[in-house]
A protein has these predicted regions:
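Active-site-adjacent pocket scaffolds in enzyme catalytic domains
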Residues: 1-5, 14-15, 34, 111-218
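Acidic-and-aromatic substrate-binding clefts and catalytic sites of carbohydrate-active enzymes
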Residues: 27-33, 60-74, 95-106, 123-133, ...
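C-terminal domain-boundary segment and adjacent tail
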Residues: 85, 113, 202-243
Length: 243
């Protein structure tokens, strides 16, 4: 209701109706569609060459973590059921607040395991707010061994200078850790958002195609980040096609 009323500026009565409507009437409920695409591709390539990660953002009261939702809600349970159907691995997306208070990472992991009764298969930060080496150290000490945050919002590409995962180096000891950083190659908002690259569809397709081919040429890991809302044609005209 609050998302439809405050974010989408729908009239209160329409927002109330949407909050009680079936999932298929929700423009943002794109999970069955894109998870089916992902599973078809993974089955074609083989499990050793493709993985589906479904990240669940942990709630906080920080303004940039809105909307504040309940991870125990029936809606989230339905999303998880779709993820399980298509064999998606469940990851933890830390709140934006955790990007500024690293001690929250462990707290949010404990909450994740309590609610979903499983260990998260990976970590990423909301809005890519893994800002300091201490954030990565806290992730490591909280039990994470795979981090998918490494990237920047403004430009797509090889932000570590490589398309392959690398181990995090503890800057205090100058030693390798077992925390693997999976560099982000392509992100939906980076391509289209006016604050970033602001590309049109044809330009975005050309950039994405070049990055995919370059990653393949060097036997890299193509790490993609797409948001469920932008995969709705009602929310964005071409991200569903590009994905």
């Amino acid at each position: 209701f609050l998302r439809a009323w405050l974010k989408e500026k729908k009239p209160p009565l329409q927002a109330l109706r949407l909050s009680f409507s079936a999932d298929v009437e929700d423009d943002y409920y794109t999970y069955p569609k894109f998870l089916k695409w992902d599973r078809e591709l993974c089955d074609k390539l083989g499990e050793d060459r493709g993985q589906i990660m479904l990240f669940i953002r942990m709630p906080s009261r920080h303004p940039l973590d809105k909307p504040l939702y309940n991870p125990r809600s029936p809606y989230i349970r339905r999303v998880l059921a779709v993820g399980a159907k298509y064999k998606a691995r469940l990851g933890l997306q830390c709140s934006y607040a955790a990007g500024h208070r690293a001690e929250r990472i462990k707290q949010e992991r404990m909450l994740f395991e309590k609610i979903f009764r499983q260990k998260p298969r990976g970590l990423r930060h909301n809005k890519l707010t893994s800002c300091e080496p201490e954030d990565l150290l806290q992730a490591y000490f909280s039990g994470f061994r795979n981090d998918y945050t490494m990237g920047y919002a403004d430009v797509v590409g090889f932000r570590l200078g490589t398309a392959r995962p690398v181990k995090f180096i503890n800057p205090n000891t100058r030693l390798l850790t077992e925390l693997i950083l999976h560099p982000l190659i392509l992100r939906d908002l980076t391509l289209s958002d006016p604050r970033y690259m602001a590309l049109e569809q044809a330009e975005a397709e050309a950039v994405a195609t070049d990055l995919v081919r370059t990653t393949a040429r060097y036997n890299g890991e193509l790490n993609l980040l797409w948001h469920n809302d932008l995969l709705s044609p009602q929310a964005h005209p071409w991200h569903s096609v590009l994905y």
